[in-house]
Regions:
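Proline-anchored loop/turn motifs at beta-strand termini and strand-loop-strand connectors
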Residues: 54-62
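Domain-scale recognition of soluble eukaryotic interaction modules
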Residues: 2-3, 65-134
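Hydrophobic, Leu/Ile/Phe/Ala-enriched alpha-helical segments that form helix-helix packing faces
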Residues: 14-18, 22-25, 57, 124-131
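Short, solvent-exposed loop/turn segments at secondary-structure junctions
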Residues: 41-42, 60, 75
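Flexible, active-site-adjacent loop/turn segments at secondary-structure boundaries
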Residues: 44, 59, 98
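Short, solvent-exposed secondary-structure capping/transition elements
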Residues: 47, 62-66
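Strand-helix-loop interaction patch of compact alpha/beta domains
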Residues: 2-49
Length: 134
């Protein structure tokens, strides 16, 4: 991809993780600070094998935790079963992203100094896979 936006700087550890992750990524400011990860692999049981995943960085990140994920284009299961808590949408850079309302739990809280974009992406990958366990 060409012309990847870098509208704000990420902490060094996040930049290193994203570069090593190997997918095109960018940062953009559109009401909030967003990290967009392109060509993000889903699962063959979704309607799109690759999407753009968006992560909103809350004010105070990395002390403030990351939450949820947004996908473009929107995902549906190919077996026709609904995906719970995905009804919300968010316009980011003139595209309508599907919000996946997923949250950390008291058993898996955000830990300052340990959690970052990399650990959040691991959760996103897990959310995509676990969708088919229900």
């Amino acid at each position: 991809m060409e012309n990847l936006r870098r509208q704000f700087d990420l902490p060094t550890e996040d930049q290193l993780f994203l570069n090593d992750y190997g997918l095109p990524w960018e940062t953009t400011v559109d009401g909030s600070h967003w990290v967009l990860i392109h060509n993000f692999a889903t699962d063959e049981r979704y309607n799109h094998p690759k999407v753009t995943a968006a992560i909103r960085l809350e004010a105070g990140y990395p002390r403030a935790g990351l939450d949820m994920v947004y996908f473009f284009p929107a995902l549906v299961r190919t077996d026709g079963k609904p995906i719970n808590r995905t009804e919300g949408t968010q316009i980011i850079a003139n595209q309508t992203f599907q919000r996946w309302s997923r949250h950390r739990t008291s058993q898996n809280p955000w830990i300052i100094g340990q959690d970052n974009i990399g650990t959040h992406i691991v959760l996103i990958e897990d959310w995509l896979a676990r969708e088919f366990e229900r």
